[in-house]
Amino acid sequence: MSEPSQAQGTPLVTPRSRRKVIAIGIAFVVILVAVGATAVYYLTLPKPFGGSIKVGFTISLTGQYNIEGTNSRRGIETVANWINSHGGLTIQGKVYNVSLDYYDDQSLPGNVPNLYTRIIQQDNATFLLAPYSSPLTTAAAPAADQYDRVMISHGGSSDLIWTQTSRRNLVAVLSPASLYLKGAVDWLKANHPTDKIAALYAQDSFSTFATQSALGYAQSLGFSVVYNASYPTNAQDLSTQLTAAKNAGADDLIGGGHYTDGLLIMNQLKTTWNTPPPKFISLLVAVTEPAFQTQLGGTANNVTGPSQWETVVTYSPTLAQAAGLPWYGPSPSEFTQLYGTLNGGATPAYHAAEAGAALLVLAIAIEQANSFNTTAVRAKLGSMHVMNFFGEYQIDSRGLQIAHSMVLVQWQAGLKKVVLPPSVADGSCQYPYSGT
């Protein structure tokens, strides 16, 4: 027979010792939970706040460019709001908000140099945005190199700003002036290649370069240019020029300059070139602003104009991924909605979008460079190829934008339609212009 097993003897663990083991186990679990919670806390501890990054600029809130300037300011403020409400910028382990420091330049180039000196030397802005318009951007650009500050251009598109003078620290987010009227000429070539063209444009560098580039392109396609004239930027009466363009036998009119003179041209067409009016009209800048249609009513119908951006042109993270590009910032709909929230329900036109994109591109470069150093941020701006709500961003060695695409818009029955290119159009171009 076998001897009794150990189990039949005295228990190895008494009830009292069992309670001690359970208590120790519970305490150990509590310690593990506490240690784990502490680890999670430190791993997710909010980054320390580093302060604000001051971005300085002048903007035209009064004077000739007040419509474009005001909308540009609103676009910049919209993107600043988005950045700050989405965690700010992380540089070297610290979080920074964006603060804006700006002055009204009154649309006068002569005001710009001293204001930028003040922004840099007295207000201590670390980075700069350029003013609205090519003349004012030209006046501001020297400060960027003189004081070694990165400056992003959102409203100065004349190629001459970069091609006539080397600009070390000036970078553009918008397509250059030489491409503005190309879409209009392309449409005419495809649909009315025998039309005769008249050009009437403002004597500033942007308007001149944009229109002359279009005329050269049109002539290379076989068009006849029967009238080519410019006018002072402060012109109050263009009836003589419009009458001369009509008498030259022109079918179409291209040119203009900015918002104020765009309205002037359209209002004076009613009495100078109305029997019949031009068959096709494409004007710079003015046409894209909602106020253009509000002030002109039916006279705006069928007028076309180039645009850097419209709300119906939807860039997205999905599109960026398909193109092999990184995506940054709000979607077009998010930008549009936030802009409306901050501005009484207003819808942004391209001046707001390009100005907002300028701040966003600057923010991306600062964060990717992980530095406030001008050389580091400028180098990042030169190497980036990204997509945001405004479209693609990439520059050449001079700082000129080479990746962004433009569209052609036309007012139709009180609505602004994108008519070119076909891939993003929400309407087809209407011809001829009737004046009503």
Over which residues does each language-model region extend?
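Short, polar/charged alpha-helical segment
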Residues: E68-I91, Q212-Y217
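Immediate post-signal peptide segment of exported/extracytoplasmic ligand-binding proteins
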Residues: L45-F57, L89-N97, K189-D195
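Segments of small-molecule ligand-sensing domains
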Residues: Y339-A353, V361-V418
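Extracytoplasmic "Venus flytrap"
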Residues: G56-E77, Y103-P109, Y132-S133, L200-T208, ...
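Beta-alpha junction/loop-to-helix N-cap segments that form part of ligand/metal-binding clefts
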Residues: I67-R74, L89-Q164, V173, Y231-L238, ...
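Extracytoplasmic ligand/sensor domains, especially the bilobed periplasmic-binding protein
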Residues: A125-N228, T275, K279-T314
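Extracellular/periplasmic periplasmic-binding protein-like sensory domains
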Residues: K270-G356, S423-D426, Q430-G435
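Secretory targeting signatures
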Residues: M1-F49, T436
